[in-house]
Amino acid sequence: MRNFTFKGLFLAAMFMVLGSLAIQAADNDGLITKQIIVKLEKAGTLPDRIGSTKRNKITNLKIIGEINGTDWRVIREMAGRSYYNDGTDGKLAILDLSEAKIVSGGGSYLYDDSYTNDNELGSCAFLNCSGLTSLSLPSGITSIDWNAFSGCSGLTSLTLPSSLTSIDSGAFSGCSGLTSLSLPSGLTSIGDGAFRGCSGLTSIYVYTEKLPNMGSGKFSIEVQKFEGFQAL
């Protein structure tokens, strides 16, 4: 009898703990805060892997595999921006694409003229995704297109891959939350106004022994590229 009572008390305690966890989850508006890992066997299948009911609840996501424009449209929706750049209920804050690969194909991810290309972070890829705080880019990308991160004011952590060779104009404009940025040694060009409005940026690290001279056609940084960079 005592043994039975002990088990009963143990089970009751377990139910109390589980109930407490359930309440905590409810208090968090039902958001999924643990990292969700999605492995795609084929580009364009992210909409099938993450249903519409869960897209607005995931806050931490890692994608493994090839992704195209169809997938990118979903990523933008999860990060708070729609196909027409309107706000969504998406709460995605942390995104890890370090084991993903951007490929061409699929539909447009923004309006009717934004498509993915192999190993390129497309123009306006994260335009106005201000809720995004941390991002690791695919290890194989070679370029970041114009306005890719424009308006990402909440972004505080960004990992750029060593394969990166060019950053286009306005790429990081308005990223006021960034305080530091490490540029890979293979970077050869930075477009006009790439860091315009990055008012919180206090340090930029460039991992190379020697920068090519201005006007060499390989690497040139002009004042307007860092307009609003108060610490420069």
Q: Positions of the model-derived regions?
A:
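A structural signal for leucine-rich repeat
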Residues: 75-82, 109-114, 217-219
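Bacterial N-terminal signal peptides
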Residues: 9-20
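Consensus positions within tandem repeat domains that build extended binding/scaffold surfaces
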Residues: 122-125, 145-150, 168-173, 191-196, ...
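A generic local structural motif
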Residues: 2, 47-49, 221, 230
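Bacterial N-terminal signal peptides that target proteins for export
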Residues: 1-11
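Structural signature of tandem-repeat unit edges
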Residues: 33-41, 59-67, 87-119, 130-143, ...
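Boundary at the C-terminal end of the N-terminal hydrophobic targeting segment
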Residues: 22-27
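Short, T/G/N/S-enriched strand-turn elements that build extracellular solenoid repeat scaffolds
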Residues: 44-54, 71-80, 216
